[in-house]
Structures are given as structure tokens and as C-alpha cells.
Amino acid sequence: DIEIAKPQPPKAAEWSVVEKLNKERELVGIYLSAHPLDDYKVILENVCNAHPADVGRTANREELAQKDKIMLGGIVTGVRTGFQKNGNPCGFVTIEDYDSSEELAFFGETWGKYMGHAIVGASLFITMKCFRKYQTSNYISLEVTDVQYLSDVKDKLIQSLTITIPADDLMTKAGAGDADDTAGEADNSNIAEDLNTLLSSSPGMTELIIQIADSETGKNLRFKSRATITVNNKIIEFIQLHENWQYSIQTERVTA
């Protein structure tokens, strides 16, 4: 018998996570399995001080002008180009985060400088400035001052993470072996170990500061770790699981 070889389908390059999610949204209308911005959730929720809708055409520029700088992040979902009346090129980029979507305008040299970042599917970190060009004018200008990829800045933006933990939460409860005394109470004996394991598995460039809060004295013991970490969703979620814990993120270096 002559064996006839069956045609094999051509090998195709595997889609990236973003491409898969975009196809998912095209078919269903929403992201189902994940969101393309999930890797940058810590930045969007703790570093950014604005959403795309906050800087749109109906933005309250008086309020925005009170901020030293406006920081927002999101994924590019649309790009269109054109020309100003003076003949200079311009671009309009639609940025979307978890909460809103807005088209941002880039004019003249600003568009020429950052147009390479305006690719549908790209995740961007955008810095803007709102100011009066002339003291005698009521018009407040809103301009883009910097555009970077979120993937390039997510490990650089957060300079330090401070975790404040009640001292009682790090102590094993008395009589932990007595079921009657500890019924309904959480066993805290492994909290420090679990936290240490989580932090150790997330090496990076961010300074880590631990504050132990003593409820009796009202004082905090502050320790600066020799190790540096990457602040990710798992760490933030672990902190949020403990209702008495607090955390703060700094974008400037601090001294312990």
C-alpha cells in the first residue's frame, strides 16, 4: 500500500497575551480571562493620579492645574492622525484603563516625539501638565510632557514600599493549642513566615520598609530591609487580606 502523507497546517507564531485578549474582546465584546493591564495594576492604582476621562475635553482644568504633574496609564485602543491649520501634523490617541476611555490630542513637536508609542495594544504611562501660559489669560493649557511604555517604567516608578503591621499580628496568640480559647481567632504564627516567603520570591529594585505598630505605646518601630523587591499584585493582595495592615508607596527615595 502507498501511504499518502496528509497535508500539515503551517506553523504559526503563538499570539502574545495582549493579542489573545484583544481577539477575545473582538469576539465577545469584553475581556474574559484577564485584562491586558493586570500586570500594571499596582502602578495604575497607586502611582497614577488621574484616569483618561479626567483629562478629556470636558476636564476640570482648574482642578488639574493644582497638581504638580498629572500621571495616567492605559492601553492604546485607537489612533488617528491629521494636520493642524498651520500644516503641522497631529495625532489623536485613545487611551483606556479599568475605569474609562478618552481620546488625547498630540500636536506639533509633541506628536513627532511620541508618535512611535501610539500603537494599538501598547500600554502607556503618560505624564501631563496643566498650566496657564499667560497670567492674564483665563485659558488653561493641558499638554503631554512625557510618554513611556508601562513595561519600561513599572519597576522604576515605585522607589519604596512601606508596610505597617500591628505588633499583635506578628505574635502567636496565647494558648494556640487550646481549641476553646482560640475558636474563631486567626492563628498568626505563620504570618511573618508567609510574608517573608512572598517578599523573597519577588526580587526587584524597590526598597522595602517594615513598620511594626505598637498599640500600647502608640509608637512605630521602623526597619529598612537590605533586600529590594518588585511590588506586584500578590504582595498588595496579601496586605489587603489583613484588615489592620496598611501600606504606602513612595515614588521618591526615603530614609528609614
Name these PLM-found stretches.
Residues 1-256:
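Noncatalytic, beta-rich nucleic-acid-contacting surfaces in large DNA/RNA-processing enzymes
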